[in-house]
C-alpha cells in the first residue's frame, strides 16, 4: 500500500512533476529539487552524498551519488539520474550507472518503458515514471504490458515486468523513493538495475562510482545498494535520509496539493533531518548493522554486498541473492532498516520494488534463488522495506517509529482503500507493483517481490517480527507493509500479484494480452502446469506446478516459462518441500502465511524459496504469487493464492491474507492481520496440513474434505478476505476461489451462514473466488484479480489448484486438480479480477480471460474447469458421485448460490470457486469434467481476464459451479462489474434475488444441503427444496433475478439490466456471449476444441479461432453485448453462464428450483414439471438430467439440484427441463426465464434456451425485463424461438426428435453430424462436429446461426432484439446447433435427451420438448440417458465446446453438448457428471456457451 500510497501519491506528484518527460521530467522533477529531490527523494540523498548512507542512499545514492554527484542533476538525474542512467547515460554518475545501466541503457528505452529498468525503477519511474507514474497507476496494466513488452528483456522485461510491477511497487516505493526519487530511483536503479539489470549493482556501482565512495561502496552498494550504504552506507546511514513512506507520501501529497513544488522540495523543507538521521540511525543502526552484516551479505555489508552485489549485478543476483537471501532475510529485515540495508532494502528493496522486482526479476531470473535475496534485499527491502517497505525501507529506514507508525497507518489506510478499491487492495499494490511486474515480468518480479515481500515480509513480517529491527519496522511495515504485506507480502506481491495478476491478467488478458497472448498464457499455464507438475513433482510440485503453473501459469503466461523456469527451479527447489507447502502454502496464503508455518524453510530458504518458490512461483508464476499471492490472484487467479487473483492465488493466499486480512477476513476475523496471522499460521498449518494432508492424502474425498475444510479454513480465513477482495477486486478470483471453495466448504459447513451472511461476503468472495478462480481466479479477477485473480486472482483456485493440484496431483488430482485448475483458472486468474473479476477473475478475477480462458480452457478445460464446471454436478456426482459430489455440490450450491449470488465477481470466484471448490472437489470426482471445465477454465480465465472473462469465468464457474454464480456472474457480469457483479449478482439478481439468492443461496445451500441430500434423494425433494429454496430463493432469484433481475437485471439484460438480468440470465448469456464469446467462444471454441480435442491443443488454435470467432462473435454479439455487454460479458460469461449460472445458480436454484426454475418460469415448471415427470423418469436421466440440470441449469447447485435432483425435478429439469430449466433456469432468470422462456423459449431455450432463453428466455423469463421485449415474445419467442428455433431447430424438432435433435437432425449441417436415431437421440458424428471448427468458428457457426436465424428470426427479432443474438442465438443455437454449435445446440437439444429434454426443453423444446421432449426425452432421454450420459458426457465435452455454445444452454448445451460433438465427450465426461459438468461446463461454457452458446446463441 505504501507503495501504492507512494505510488499513488508520489507517483502522482511525481507524475505531475515528472509526467512530462520521462527522462527529463524526472530529472526536471528532480532538478527542481536536484539535491533536494535527491535528498528528499533520496533519503540518503543528503547522506547520499556522504555515502549515500546506506545502500539506500547508495542506491539512492547511486542516484544520489550520481545525483549528488551529478548534483541536482544527479539527483534529478540520479533520481532520474538513475533514470537518466536508464534514460540518459549522460548523467555522470548515471553514466556509470549507465555503465551499469548500459543494459539499462538498452533498457533505457525500455527502461523507461520498462520501468523495469528498475534500474531506475524510481528513475524509470521518474523517467519512465512520467509514463511510469501514469503507469504507476496504469502500472499494473501498463506495467504489465510493459512487462509484456519488457518480457523481451530477459530481466528487464521480466523483471521489469516485475520491475514495473515492482515499479509499481517500486514506483510507489520508487515513487516514494522516487519521490525520494533519487533514493529508490537510484536504489531501484541500483537494485533495479542491479537487480533488474543487475545494473543497479553496476548502476549502484556506477552511480556509486561517481560517488567515489559509493562507487566503491557502490560496487558493494551495487551489490546491495546496501553495499554503497555499507561502506558509506553506515556513515551515510547517519545522513542517509530515508524517506519514510509517510514522508514521501506526505511530500507527494503536498506536491499534489500544490503545497510544495516538488516532493524533494517538500522534503527539504519539511523533512526533519533529525528524523531522518534518527530514523536511519535507529533502524539503520540495528538494521544496517545486522542487516548490513546479513545484508552485508546482501547489499548491506559492503564487502559481502560487493560480492553479492556482483552476483546480483551479474546474474548472480541469485548468488548474491542467495547469500543475501539468508542474510537478506536478516538483511531483508534489516536491510530495509539499514540504510545500507535500507539502501539495499530501500535501494534494493526500495529499488526492489523495482529492483528487487528487477532483481527478483533478475533474481527470479536467477531465480532468485533468492529473489528474496538479491531481490531479497530488494525484496527484503521491498518486501520488508519496500513492501512496506521500500517505503518501509526507505521509510523504515529513515523513519522514526512515529513516522513508521504513521506510515504504517497510512499504508494501512491505503491498503485498505486499495483493498477496497482494488481487488486486493493490499495485494493490488504489490500486485500492482510486483504483481503487475510479476504479472508481467511480474511473476518473477512479483514472485520475487512477493518473495521479497514474503521473505521480507516473512522475514520482514516474520523475520521482521522476529527481528527487532524489523520488529518495529517490520511490524509497522509488516503490519503496515509486510504484515499486510506480510500477508500482503506475499499477498501484496501475491495479492498484488494476484490482483495484479488478475488485473494483469485481466488487463493482460484484456489489455496486455491479446487473446492470443492469453491463449499463449494459457498454454504456458498449461505448459507450466505440466512442467511444474513434473518439475514440481507431484505433491508439492504437483501442487506447486499447478499452482505455479496455474498461478504462475496464469501469470506464467506473463512471465513465461523462462522466468518462470528460472524461478520455478528456484521456486520449486527451494520451495520444493517447503514449497510444497509453499505452493500449497503459496496457495495458502501466501505461503507467506504458509511461510510462517513453514517459516524455516519458507522463510529462510523457502521463504525465499517461497519467495522463489512462492516467489518463484511468484516469480515464476506471477500467478503463483498470484496464486500464491493472488491466489497469491490471484490468483490465482489467482487465482487466489489471483486470482486471484486472484485474483487469484494471491487471492487465494493473498486474498486470504490480504483479503482476509484486509477484507473479508477482517470483517470476518478480528483483524485482518490478526486474523491473518492466526489464520495464516493456523491456516498454514492447517492448510499445510490440510492441504498437504489432502495432498498427501491425495484422497479426493479426503482431499476434498480436507481441502474443503482447509479451504474453508483457509478460505475462510483467506477467503473472506479474499472475498472482499474478490468482491472488490478481481482478486476475488483468487480470493473467492477460496471463498468459493471456502464457500463451498464453508458453504458446506455453513451454507446459511456463509451463504447468507458471510457467505455473502465470503460467498461472494467465495464465488468470486470460485470465479476468480477467477481472478482468477480469478478472478483476481483473478481480479481481480483474478485478480485474483484476480486474483483472482485464485486463492482458492490456487489453493485448490495448489493444494488441489497438489492434492490433485497427489490425490485430489482430478478433482482437486480440476478444482485447482478451475480455480486456477479462476484464480488466475484472476485474477484479478484481478480481475478483478472484473476481477478479479479478474482478475483477476478474477480478467477477461480470453487468454485466461485459453489457459483455462486448456487447463481447466482439461481439468478443473470442466470439473469445476461440472464439478458441482458432475464432479460431485462423479466424484462423490452424487453423494460426495453431491455433498460437494450441496455445499457448492450453497456456496455457489450464495457466494455466487453474493458475488458476481466473487460469483465468478465464488460461484465458480464454489463450483470449483465444490465442483472442483467434485470435479475431482470427475476430472474429466475438469477438462470440460475447461470452460471453467475459460471461465476462470475469463474472469481472470476480464470481468467478462471474469464474469465469464464467473459464469462459467457459476455456470459450471453454480448457477448461483450465474446470478453472481450477472453480477460479475455486471460487476465487471466486478463489484457490481457481486452486487450485481445480488443486485441483478436483484438484491433480493441475489440476496434471495443468498437467500436462495442459503436456501440453495439449504436446499443444496437439503437438495443435496434431498436432491439425490428426492429429486423432487430437491425439487421442492430447491424449488422451495429456489422458489423462494431461486424463484426470487428467478423472479428477482428473473423478475427482478429480469426486470432490473433483465432490463439490464436488454441493456445493462440485461446485464444483471441478462447478465443474470441472458445478458449473461448473450453478452456473456459477448465477453464470453471471447471466452465463450473461446471457451466455445475451446469447448469445441475440448470437444474436439478435449485436449488443449486445439484449444490454442481453437482458442485463437475462438478469439477470432469471438471477435466476430463479439461483433455479432455486440448487439447482445451492447445490450448486455458489460454484463453480458461477465454475465454472458457469468450470466451466460451466469445465466446459466445465476440461472444456474438460480437455475441452480431454478434448477434446483428447477421445478422452481421451471416454476419460475412457470413454464419451466412446465418443462420442469414435465421434466420432473420426466425427471423422475429421467431420474436416471435425472442423473443426466441432474447433470443436465445441473449442467444445464444448475450448472452448480441446480446442477446439483438438478443433478442432485438428478432425479428431482431437476432431474427432469436437468435433463431437459433442466436443460430448459437450466437454460431457463440457467438463465434462470434468463434461463429461468428461459424456463419459462426456456420453456417457452424452450425453443429459445432450445435455440438458445440457455442463450436465447437466457436472453430470450432470460429475457423471456425475466421477460419481465427482456420479456418486455421478448418477454412475451420471448417466451413465445422463446417458444417461438424455441419453436422457431425448434421449428427451425427442428421443425421436426418437435417431439419426434427432440427439437434440438430434430433441429439438429434437420439442420442440414448438423444433419451431417447428427443423425436421428430410433431412440430419438441423435447420434452425432463427432468427427464432423468435433472439428470444432464450427464452434471454433463460432462465427461460422453464427453464420449458420444466421442462417437459421431467420427462422429464429422472428424469435430472433425479439431475440434479435433480445439479442438478435438471441435469435441468432437461437438460430445461432440452432444454427449453432446446426452449425456445430448448432449441432451442439441442436444436438444439444437433441442430445439433450437427457438433458436434451432439457435441451430441447431448453431449446424451446423444453417446454414442448420439455414436455414432449421431456416425455419424449424421457423415453429418449431415458435411454439416451445412458447415452446421454455418455453423450452428455460427450456433450458435455462437446458442450465444453458445444457447451460453450451451449453455455447458457450449457445445460442445454449439455444436451446440446451432447448434441454436440461432445456427446462422446460427453461420454467422456462423466456423462452425466460430465454432462453436468457439461452443464457446468456449459455454464462454464456458459461463458462459452453462454458466450459461446449465448454468444453463439445469442449471437
UniProtKB/Swiss-Prot annotation:
**Recorded name of the encoding gene:** BCL9L
Q: Which family does it belong to?
A: Belongs to the BCL9 family.
Location of the region described as Disordered in the Swiss-Prot/TrEMBL record: 1-238, 271-500, 888-1084, 1116-1201
Q: Where is the composition biased (Basic and acidic residues)?
A: 114-126, 134-153, 399-421
Segments carrying the region annotation (Necessary for interaction with CTNNB1) are 304-533
Compositionally biased spans, kind Pro residues: 20-37, 281-291, 301-325, 445-458, 1122-1132, 1168-1179
Question: Compositional bias of type Gly residues: which residue ranges?
Answer: 222-232
Comp. bias intervals (Polar residues): 45-70, 85-96, 193-205, 935-960, 978-996, 1019-1041, 1069-1084
Q: Where is this cross-link: Glycyl lysine isopeptide (Lys-Gly) (interchain with G-Cter in SUMO2)?
A: 1344
Task: Show the domain comment.
Answer: Tne C-terminal domain is important for its transactivation activity.
- Alphabetically list the UniProt keywords: Acetylation, Activator, Isopeptide bond, Methylation, Nucleus, Phosphoprotein, Transcription, Transcription regulation, Ubl conjugation
Name this polypeptide is given:
B-cell CLL/lymphoma 9-like protein
The N6-acetyllysine modification is found at 36, 108, 110, 137
Q: By its UniProt entry, which Pfam families does this protein fall under?
A: BCL9
Amino acid at each position: 500500500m505504501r507503495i501504492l500510497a507512494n505510488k499513488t501519491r508520489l507517483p502522482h506528484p511525481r507524475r505531475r512533476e515528472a509526467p512530462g518527460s520521462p527522462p527529463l521530467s524526472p530529472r526536471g522533477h528532480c532538478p527542481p529539487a536536484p539535491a533536494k529531490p535527491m535528498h528528499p527523494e533520496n533519503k540518503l540523498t543528503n547522506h547520499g552524498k556522504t555515502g549515500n548512507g546506506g545502500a539506500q542512499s547508495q542506491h539512492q545514492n547511486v542516484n544520489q551519488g550520481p545525483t549528488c554527484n551529478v548534483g541536482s542533476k544527479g539527483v534529478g538525474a540520479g533520481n532520474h539520474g538513475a533514470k537518466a542512467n536508464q534514460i540518459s547515460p549522460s548523467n555522470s554518475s548515471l553514466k556509470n550507472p549507465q555503465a551499469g545501466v548500459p543494459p539499462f541503457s538498452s533498457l533505457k528505452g525500455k527502461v523507461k518503458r520498462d520501468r523495469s529498468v528498475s534500474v531506475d525503477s524510481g528513475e524509470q519511474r521518474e523517467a519512465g515514471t512520467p509514463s511510469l507514474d501514469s503507469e504507476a497507476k496504469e502500472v499494473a496494466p501498463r506495467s504489465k504490458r510493459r512487462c509484456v513488452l519488457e518480457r523481451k528483456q530477459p530481466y528487464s522485461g521480466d523483471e521489469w515486468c516485475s520491475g514495473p510491477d515492482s515499479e509499481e511497487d517500486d514506483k510507489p516505493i520508487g515513487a516514494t523513493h522516487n519521490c525520494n526519487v533519487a533514493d529508490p530511483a537510484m536504489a531501484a536503479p541500483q537494485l533495479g538495475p542491479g537487480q533488474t539489470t543487475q545494473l543497479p549493482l553496476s548502476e549502484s556501482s556506477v552511480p556509486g562510482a561517481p560517488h567515489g565512495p559509493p562507487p566503491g561502496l557502490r560496487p558493494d552498494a551495487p551489490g546491495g545498494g546496501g553495499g554503497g550504504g555499507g561502506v558509506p552506507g553506515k556513515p551515510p546511514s547517519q545522513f542517509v535520509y530515508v524517506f519514510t513512506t509517510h514522508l514521501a507520501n506526505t511530500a507527494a501529497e503536498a506536491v499534489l496539493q500544490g503545497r510544495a513544488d516538488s516532493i524533494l522540495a517538500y522534503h527539504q523543507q519539511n523533512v526533519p533531518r533529525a528524523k531522518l538521521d534518527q530514523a536511519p540511525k535507529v533502524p539503520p543502526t540495528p538494521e544496517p548493522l545486522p542487516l548490513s552484516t546479513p545484508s552485508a551479505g546482501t547489499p548491506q555489508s559492503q564487502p559481502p554486498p560487493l560480492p553479492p552485489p556482483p552476483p546480483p549485478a551479474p546474474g548472480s543476483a541469485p548468488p548474491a541473492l542467495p547469500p543475501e537471501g539468508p542474510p537478506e532475510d536478516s538483511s531483508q529485515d534489516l536491510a530495509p532498516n539499514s540504510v545500507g540495508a535500507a539502501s539495499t532494502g530501500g535501494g534494493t528493496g526500495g529499488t526492489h520494488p523495482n529492483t528487487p522486482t528487477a532483481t527478483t526479476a533478475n533474481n527470479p531470473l536467477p531465480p532468485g534463488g533468492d529473489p528474496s535475496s538479491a531481490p531479497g534485499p530488494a525484496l527484503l527491502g521491498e518486501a520488508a522495506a519496500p513492501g512496506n517497505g521500500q517505503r518501509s525501507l526507505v521509510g523504515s529506514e529513515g523513519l522514526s517509529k512515529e513516522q513508521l507508525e504513521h506510515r504504517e497507518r497510512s499504508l494501512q489506510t491505503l491498503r485498505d482503500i486499495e483493498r477496497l478499491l482494488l481487488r486486493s487492495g493490499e495485494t493490488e499494490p504489490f500486485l500492482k507493483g510486483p504483481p503487475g511486474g510479476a504479472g508481467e515480468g511480474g511473476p518473477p518480479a512479483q514472485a520475487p517481490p512477493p518473495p521479497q515481500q514474503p521473505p521480507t515480509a516473512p522475514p520482514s513480517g516474520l523475520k521482521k517480527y522476529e527481528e527487532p529491527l524489523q520488529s518495529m519496522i517490520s511490524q509497522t511495515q509488516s503490519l503496515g507493509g509486510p504484515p499486510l504485506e506480510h500477508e500482503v507480502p506475499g499477498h501484496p506481491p501475491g495479492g498484488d500479484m494476484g490482483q495484479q495478476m488478475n488485473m494483469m491478467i485481466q488487463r493482460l488478458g484484456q489489455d496486455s494480452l491479446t487473446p492470443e497472448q492469453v491463449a499463449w498464457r494459457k498454454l504456458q499455464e498449461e505448459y507450466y502446469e505440466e512442467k511444474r507438475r513434473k518439475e514440481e513433482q507431484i505433491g508439492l510440485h504437483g501442487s506447486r506446478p499447478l499452482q505455479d503453473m496455474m498461478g504462475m501459469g496464469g501469470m506464467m503466461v506473463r512471465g513465461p516459462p523462462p522466468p518462470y523456469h528460472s524461478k520455478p527451479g528456484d521456486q520449486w527447489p527451494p520451495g520444493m518441500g517447503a514449497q510444497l507447502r509453499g505452493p500449497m502454502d503459496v496457495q495458502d496464503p501466501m505461503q507467506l502465511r504458509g511461510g510462517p508455518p513453514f517459516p524455516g524453510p519458507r522463510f529462510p530458504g523457502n521463504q525465499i524459496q517461497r519467495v522463489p518458490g512462492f516467489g518463484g512461483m511468484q516469480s515464476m508464476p506471477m500467478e503463483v504469487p498470484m496464486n500464491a499471492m493472488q491466489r497469491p490472484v490471484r490468483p490465482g487467479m489467482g487465482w487466489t493464492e489471483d486470482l486471484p487473483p486472484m485474483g487469484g492465488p494471491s487471492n487465494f493466499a493473498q486474498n486470504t491474507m490480504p483479503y482476509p486480512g484486509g477484507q473479508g477476513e477482517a470483517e470476518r476475523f478480528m483483524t485482518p492481520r490478526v486474523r491473518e496471522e492466526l489464520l495464516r499460521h493456523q491456516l498454514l498449518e492447517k492448510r499445510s496440513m490440510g492441504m498437504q494432508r489432502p495432498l498427501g492424502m491425495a484422497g479426493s474425498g479426503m482431499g476434498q474434505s480436507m481441502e474443503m475444510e482447509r479451504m474453508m479454513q483457509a478460505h475462510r480465513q483467506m477467503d473472506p478476505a479474499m472475498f472482499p477482495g474478490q468482491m472488490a477486486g478481481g482478486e476475488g478470483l483468487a480470493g473467492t476461489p477460496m471463498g468459493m471453495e471456502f464457500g463451498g466448504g464453508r458453504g458446506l459447513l455453513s451454507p446459511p451462514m456463509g451463504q447468507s451472511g458471510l457467505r455473502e461476503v465470503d460467498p461472494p468472495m467465495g464465488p468470486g473466488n470460485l470465479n476468480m478462480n477467477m481472478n482468477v481466479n480469478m478472478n483476481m479477477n483473478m481480479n481481480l484479480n483474478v485478480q485474483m485473480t484476480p486474483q483472482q486472482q485464485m486463492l482458492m483456485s490456487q489453493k485448490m489448484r495448489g493444494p488441489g493440484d497438489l492434492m490433485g496431483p497427489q490425490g485430489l488430482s482430478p478433482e482437486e486438480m480440476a478444482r485447482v485448475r478451475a480455480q486456477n483458472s479462476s484464480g488466475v486468474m484472476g485474477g484479478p479480477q484481478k480481475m478483478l473479476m472484473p476481477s478479479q477473475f479478474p482478475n483477476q478475477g478474477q480478467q477477461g480471460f480470453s487468454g485466461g480462458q485459453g489457459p483455462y480452457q486448456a487447463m481447466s478445460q482439461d481439468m478443473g474447469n470442466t470439473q469445476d464446471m461440472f464439478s458441482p454436478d458432475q464432479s460431485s456426482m462423479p466424484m462423490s458421485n452424487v453423494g460426495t459430489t453431491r455433498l460437494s455440490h450441496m455445499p457448492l450450491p450453497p456456496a455457489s448460490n450464495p457466494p455466487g449470488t453474493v458475488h458476481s465477481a466473487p460469483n465468478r470466484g465464488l460461484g465458480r470457486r464454489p463450483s470449483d471448490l465444490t465442483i472442483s472437489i467434485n470435479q475431482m470426482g470427475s476430472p474429466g469434467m475438469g477438462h470440460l471445465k475447461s470452460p471453467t477454465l475459460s471461465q476462470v480465465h475469463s474472469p481472470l481476464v476480464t470481468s467478462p472473462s471474469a464474469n465469464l469465468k464467473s459464469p462459467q464457474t457459476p455456470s459450471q459451479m453454480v448457477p448461483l454464480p450465474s446470478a453472481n456472474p450477472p453480477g460479475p457480469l455486471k460487476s465487471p462489474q466486478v463489484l457490481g457483479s457481486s452486487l450485481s449478482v445480488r443486485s441483478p439478481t436483484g438484491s433480493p434475488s441475489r440476496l434471495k439468492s443468498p437467500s436462495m443461496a442459503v436456501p440453495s445451500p439449504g436446499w443444496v444441503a437439503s437438495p443435496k441430500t434431498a436432491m439425490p434423494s428426492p429429486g423432487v425433494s430437491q425439487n421442492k427444496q430447491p424449488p422451495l429454496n429456489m422458489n423462494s430463493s431461486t424463484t426470487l432469484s428467478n423472479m428477482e433475478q428473473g423478475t427482478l433481475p429480469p426486470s432490473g437485471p433483465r432490463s439490464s439484460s436488454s441493456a445493462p439490466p440485461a446485464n444483471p438480468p441478462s447478465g443474470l440470465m441472458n445478458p449473461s448469456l448473450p453478452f456473456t456471449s459477448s465477453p464470453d464469446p471471447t471466452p465463450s467462444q473461446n471457451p466455445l471454441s475451446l469447448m469445441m476444441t475440448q470437444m474436439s480435442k478435449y485436449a488443449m491443443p486445439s484449444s490454442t488454435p481453437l482458442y485463437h479461432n475462438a478469439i477470432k470467432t469471438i471477435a466476430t462473435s463479439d461483433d455479432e454479439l455486440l448487439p447482445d453485448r451492447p445490450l448486455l455487454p458489460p454484463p453480458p460479458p461477465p454475465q454472458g460469461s457469468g450470466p451466460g453462464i451466469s445465466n446459466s449460472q445465476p440461472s444456474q445458480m438460480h437455475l441452480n436454484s431454478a434448477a434446483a428450483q428447477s421445478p422452481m426454475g421451471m416454476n419460475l418460469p412457470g413454464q419451466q415448471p412446465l418443462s420442469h414439471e414435465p421434466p420432473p415427470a420426466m425427471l423422475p423418469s429421467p431420474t436416471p436421466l435425472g442423473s443426466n438430467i441432474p447433470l443436465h440440470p445441473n449442467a444445464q441449469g444448475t450448472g452448480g447447485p441446480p446442477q446439483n439440484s438438478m443433478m442432485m435432483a438428478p432425479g428431482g425435478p431437476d432431474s427432469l429439469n436437468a435433463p431437459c427441463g433442466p436443460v430448459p430449466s437450466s437454460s431457463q433456469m440457467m438463465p434462470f432468470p434468463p434461463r429461468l426465464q428461459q424456463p419459462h422462456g426456456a420453456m417457452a423459449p424452450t425453443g429459445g431455450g432450445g435455440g438458445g434456451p440457455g442463450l436465447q432463453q437466457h436472453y430470450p428466455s432470460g429475457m423471456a423469463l425475466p421477460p419481465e425485463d427482456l420479456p418486455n421485449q421478448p418477454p412475451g415474445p420471448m417466451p413465445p419467442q422463446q417458444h417461438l424461438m424455441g419453436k422457431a428455433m425448434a421449428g427451425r431447430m427442428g421443425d421436426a424438432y418437435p417431439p419426434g426428435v427432440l427439437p434440438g435433435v430434430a433441429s439438429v437432425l434437420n439442420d442440414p449441417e448438423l444433419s451431417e453430424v447428427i443423425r436421428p436415431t430410433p431412440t430419438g437421440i441423435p447420434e452425432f458424428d463427432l468427427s464432423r462436429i468435433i472439428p470444432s471448427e464450427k464452434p471454433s468458428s463460432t462465427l461460422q457457426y453464427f453464420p449458420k446461426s444466421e442462417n437459421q436465424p431467420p427462422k429464429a428470426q422472428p424469435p430472433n427479432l425479439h431475440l434479435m432484439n433480445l439479442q438478435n443474438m438471441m435469435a441468432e442465438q437461437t438460430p445461432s443455437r440452432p444454427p449453432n446447433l446446426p452449425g456445430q454449435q448448432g449441432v451442439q445446440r441442436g444436438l444439444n437439444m437433441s442430445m439433450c435427451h437427457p438433458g436434451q429434454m432439457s435441451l430441447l426443453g431448453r431449446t424451446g423444446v423444453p417446454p414442448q420438448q420439455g414436455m414432449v421432449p421431456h416425455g419424449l426425452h424421457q423415453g429418449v432421454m431415458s435411454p439416451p440417458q445412458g447415452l446421454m450420459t455418455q453423450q452428455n458426457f460427450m456433450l458435455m465435452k462437446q458442450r465444453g465446446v458445444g457447451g460453450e455454445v451451449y453455455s447458457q444452454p450449457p445445460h442445454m448445451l449439455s444436451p446440446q453438448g451432447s448434441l454436440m460433438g461432445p456427446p462422446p465427450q460427453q461420454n467422456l465426461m462423466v456423462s452425466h457428471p460430465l454432462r453436468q459438468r457439461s452443464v457446468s461446463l456449459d455454464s462454464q461454457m456458459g461463458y462459452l456457451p453462454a458466450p459461446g452458446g449465448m454468444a453463439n446463441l445469442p449471437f
